[in-house]
Structure formats: structure tokens, C-alpha cells
Amino acid sequence: MLDIKRKQDHIEINLTKNVESGLSSGFESVQFVHNALPEINYSSIDTTTTFLNKILQAPILISSMTGGTPRARDINCRLAAAAQKAGIAMGLGSMRTLLTEPSTLDTFTVRNNAPDIVLLANIGAVQLNYGVTPKQCQYLVDSVKADALILHLNVLQELTQPEGDKNWENLLPKIKEVVNYLSVPVIIKEVGFGLSKKTAKQFIDIGVKILDVAGSGGTSWSQVEAYRATNSLQNRIASSFINWGIPTLDSLKMVREASKDISVIASGGLKSGIDGAKAIRMGADIFGLAGPFLKAADVSENLVSEEIQLIIEQLKITMMCTGSRTINNLKKAELRMNHIPL
């Protein structure tokens, strides 16, 4: 029940408090060079891409948010239905509660709403140090008919959480066991503090093929935990890390330096389809957002669909104004960083 209460707290805090990182994602330092004569019909702009052997209508992921509570069930169902209509991907929130509270399964079960989407199951990697087995990870995947499993890395959040899991020793070999055991790919994802080149290489070396950089610039989970603190000392400790992390743009560059061959998801502080286009240009295969979708999904499916359409139109207009008919063209679009052409 403690896990369920924590999830309730997380939803409420994210919706009602300012929990943004004190750092920027870095994308404001990158600008596309405007193409005044693109020689393209807007109707021919093609945002489709392939991810996990499925076609996405746009390279967008609704990043992992929640699960385990009635409110989370409604949010996930609305997100999934809107993702199905738009043809984009979706990640589920941490599914640890499902292993201890089987009755929470319906808060994660969205395939009826979204039979065709790329769907990602999710659990904290550190749980492998607390008894979660590869077999249980496969159960999480099977229970929601997921296309992959996210193992998220949230060390700073755990260390600033009153009930956090603090033993991260010898975790990499256990992650490797899961990578080798599962019938679907494992995605390694940070939660808002970024992946370095060194860390990315550690995962690539054990066979991980997909990394989500989830850099700083958006939600700071240390700030979320500051609001959950049960005393002033805990609050002060968590609050002091407001400027911690690797900005998303920097993390994206680092991960791409580690490998040109893996799939990379850019998330963390992206605010629009314009930011998403910049992420694609800088090396991401798809990009993820959470905050804008959470607020919409707490209200209605229609608002989620409107938010998705906004991001897609921003992406398409950016593609048009850079002369990029396809996502592959966008990856080569002309950029300026700090007023210096790239």
C-alpha cells in the first residue's frame, strides 16, 4: 500500500507543484536555419518512422508517468487511446506495484484501448537488487502485452525519497541477466538527470540496444521528493539538487558519441515539436514528453489528442521550414548553435 500512496503523491505533486529542474534542457542553444524556399508541398511532409519493428506516424513517445491507482488507470487509458489514434508510442509508469498488488493490473492494461501502438512496460532497475527476477520482468511484459521493457535508473530520486532503495551495488550484472532473458528488448532510461557517455557504454557492452537519455531540463524527481519529505531535513536535502543532472542535449550528444548504431530516445524538458525536431537532428530516433500529456490526460482523452496534434503540427512545420520532406531529411537539416553554423 505504501507504493500506491507514493504513486498518488507523485501524480498530485506533478499536477499541482512546480517541480521543474533548475537546469535547461539545452535545446534553446540550437536553432534551425530557416529555408525560405523549401520547394515542398506541406501535404507531402512525412513524419513516419519505425521503432521496435512497428511504424509510428510520428517519432513521438508519451513518456512513462504513472500506474497503480484508480486515477492512474484513467490517465493511462486516455493516453493510450489518444496514442492509438495518432499512431505514436507510449510508456507505462513503474509497474512494481503489480508484483505486490496484483489487483492493480487494470491500471496498466491499455491494450484494449490501443491494440496497435508501441507499448513499453516499466520497472525500476534497482528493484533487481531487492528480489525482482528476470522471470518477474517477463511477467510484467506479458501482462500488458508490451513491445519492450524499460528499466529506469532513478538513483537520485531513491536517495532523496524517505522510503528510497539505496543499494545500487552490483546492479549491472543483474540488468544483463534481464537483457538476456527477456523475449523483448530492454530499454535503459534515466528519469530526468541524463546518461553520460561512460554509462551508455556500460549498457551497450552488455547488449542493450535502446537508451532513453531522459536528461535534465524538465521534471526533477528530487524536487518531487522534496514535497513528499516528512521533515525539514529531508526537504532541504532533496531541494538542494534542483540544479543536478546532465542537460538533455548534452546527454544526447554523449550517448551518440558512445554509439552510432543503437536506438536513442531523447526526453527530458522537451516542450514542443520544435524541440523534438532539434532532438531528431542531434541524433535521436524518437523523442518523448510527459508533463504536457499528464495535465491533459487528467482531464480528457480529447485534450491529450489535441496536445499530440499540436506537437505533430509543430514538427511538420519545422520540417517544412527546413526543407525536410522526411524524418531522414530532418536528420541532415542545417543548424546553428550559438550563432555558429553546424
Swiss-Prot record:
<dbReference type="InterPro" id="IPR011179">
    <property type="entry name" value="IPdP_isomerase"/>
</dbReference>
<feature type="binding site">
    <location>
        <position position="63"/>
    </location>
    <ligand>
        <name>FMN</name>
    </ligand>
</feature>
<dbReference type="InterPro" id="IPR013785">
    <property type="entry name" value="Aldolase_TIM"/>
</dbReference>
<feature type="binding site">
    <location>
        <begin position="94"/>
        <end position="96"/>
    </location>
    <ligand>
        <name>substrate</name>
    </ligand>
</feature>
<keyword id="KW-0288">FMN</keyword>
<feature type="binding site">
    <location>
        <position position="189"/>
    </location>
    <ligand>
        <name>FMN</name>
    </ligand>
</feature>
<feature type="binding site">
    <location>
        <begin position="64"/>
        <end position="66"/>
    </location>
    <ligand>
        <name>FMN</name>
    </ligand>
</feature>
<comment type="similarity">
    <text>Belongs to the IPP isomerase type 2 family.</text>
</comment>
<dbReference type="InterPro" id="IPR000262">
    <property type="entry name" value="FMN-dep_DH"/>
</dbReference>
<keyword id="KW-0963">Cytoplasm</keyword>
<dbReference type="GO" id="GO:0004452">
    <property type="term" value="F:isopentenyl-diphosphate delta-isomerase activity"/>
</dbReference>
<dbReference type="GO" id="GO:0070402">
    <property type="term" value="F:NADPH binding"/>
</dbReference>
<feature type="binding site">
    <location>
        <position position="122"/>
    </location>
    <ligand>
        <name>FMN</name>
    </ligand>
</feature>
<feature type="binding site">
    <location>
        <begin position="290"/>
        <end position="291"/>
    </location>
    <ligand>
        <name>FMN</name>
    </ligand>
</feature>
<keyword id="KW-0414">Isoprene biosynthesis</keyword>
<feature type="binding site">
    <location>
        <position position="158"/>
    </location>
    <ligand>
        <name>Mg(2+)</name>
    </ligand>
</feature>
<feature type="binding site">
    <location>
        <position position="219"/>
    </location>
    <ligand>
        <name>FMN</name>
    </ligand>
</feature>
<keyword id="KW-0521">NADP</keyword>
<keyword id="KW-0479">Metal-binding</keyword>
<keyword id="KW-0413">Isomerase</keyword>
<feature type="binding site">
    <location>
        <position position="94"/>
    </location>
    <ligand>
        <name>FMN</name>
    </ligand>
</feature>
<feature type="binding site">
    <location>
        <begin position="6"/>
        <end position="7"/>
    </location>
    <ligand>
        <name>substrate</name>
    </ligand>
</feature>
<dbReference type="Pfam" id="PF01070">
    <property type="entry name" value="FMN_dh"/>
</dbReference>
<keyword id="KW-0285">Flavoprotein</keyword>
<dbReference type="GO" id="GO:0008299">
    <property type="term" value="P:isoprenoid biosynthetic process"/>
</dbReference>
<protein>
    <recommendedName>
        <fullName>Isopentenyl-diphosphate delta-isomerase</fullName>
        <ecNumber>5.3.3.2</ecNumber>
    </recommendedName>
</protein>
<dbReference type="GO" id="GO:0005737">
    <property type="term" value="C:cytoplasm"/>
</dbReference>
<feature type="binding site">
    <location>
        <begin position="269"/>
        <end position="271"/>
    </location>
    <ligand>
        <name>FMN</name>
    </ligand>
</feature>
<comment type="subunit">
    <text>Homooctamer. Dimer of tetramers.</text>
</comment>
<dbReference type="GO" id="GO:0016491">
    <property type="term" value="F:oxidoreductase activity"/>
</dbReference>
<feature type="binding site">
    <location>
        <position position="157"/>
    </location>
    <ligand>
        <name>substrate</name>
    </ligand>
</feature>
<dbReference type="GO" id="GO:0000287">
    <property type="term" value="F:magnesium ion binding"/>
</dbReference>
<dbReference type="GO" id="GO:0010181">
    <property type="term" value="F:FMN binding"/>
</dbReference>
<comment type="function">
    <text>Involved in the biosynthesis of isoprenoids. Catalyzes the 1,3-allylic rearrangement of the homoallylic substrate isopentenyl (IPP) to its allylic isomer, dimethylallyl diphosphate (DMAPP).</text>
</comment>
<keyword id="KW-0460">Magnesium</keyword>
